[in-house]
Amino acid sequence: MIWQNSARLKTIIASASTAAALLCAWSLSAPRVAVAQHFKPSAAPVTCATCHNGVATSYATAPMRHAMEPQGADPAMNAHPDLTAQIGGYTYTVKTRNGQSTYTVSDGTGALTLPIQWIFGQHSQTWVLEKDGHYYESLVSYFPRANGLAITPGDQKITPHNLTEAMGRRLPIWETRTCFNCHGSGVTPGEKLVPAKVTPGLDCERCHAGSRQHMADAVQENFKSLPKSLKRLDSEQISDFCGQCHRTWDTVMRNKWHGPAFVRFQPYRLEISKCFIGNDPRISCLACHNPHQPVNHTAISYDVKCLACHAGAKTASTPPNAKTCPVAKENCTSCHMPKVDLPGGHAQFTDHYIRVVHAGEPYPE
């Protein structure tokens, strides 16, 4: 997210293109003849969906595909055409009309209005605004839980002295690039960032480097070049891969971040769990989450994942790999991965630090 300054470090998978997430599955299991018949001169332009229609259709509704929305395409903005908040001495108004959204801040004597071109986030939303060639993170964001506007997390201590400062926090170049790179596709390392050329949301190439070349080769019936497959990564490498945007233990430690505000950094929290073993595929981001599908929020749906380790009585041939829970056999995450209120974020995040939770205990670092 763009809510905190950060250095995205970790180099275990430095050859991978930066991503927060894991997008389009790549498995050419069909015979070459069956695949090649897709690529006829009269056919529509080749896309990932040409061969991977099932995955592409599912991914169209996945959160990462909508990590950033262009104006006019965002359901939340269209469903809330008028948003207003009074914060300090400033009034904030967000209006959406005919697919166009504007962001206005006024102090009673003057006003500043800018178009909202980039909408970051699928649920809670922050906007990046452009003024005089510089980019700003909106000082207020939209929160469904609050059903309105509130201060953007991380910006609570900002005291604006004029309309421009009240509009939002000016982003340094590196942070602007990071924001667009983790919420969009097409940011080229080493080149000047041109937000207008960034594709909103994460496309297949973002996690499966080489997919564009693979499509170009497939048109020529050359199937030797394959895009990056995340199936070959172990649990620690997957955590680092996702953590390029969702943050890793290394990133948090280097920045000396502390407190419940960082519960939203799932790879970091998962890595400090006692049961996290870097080479065990049963506990990893992909073991519980299919990035090509919407997130399943029901606790019981994750029980089978937990029971992959914590199940069964000990026998001579199949000893259990971990202790079984003496309390319950279902809704494991409701006790061992509690939801934590994000300070100032008007939202709850599941704490991925897997542990035995004791009532009333302080937030564990």
Segments (PLM) and residue ranges:
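Post-cleavage N-terminal segment of exported redox proteins
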Residues: 1-37, 151, 247-264, 281-283, ...
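Primarily the internal scaffold of c-type cytochrome electron-transfer domains
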Residues: 46, 54-120, 126-128, 152-164, ...
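Ordered, soluble secondary-structure elements with a strong preference for glycine-centered loop motifs
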Residues: 37, 55, 169
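Extended acidic/polar, glycine-enriched regions
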Residues: 130-139, 143-177, 185, 189
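Local sequence-structure signature of Cys/Sec-based thiol-disulfide redox active-site neighborhoods
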Residues: 38-53
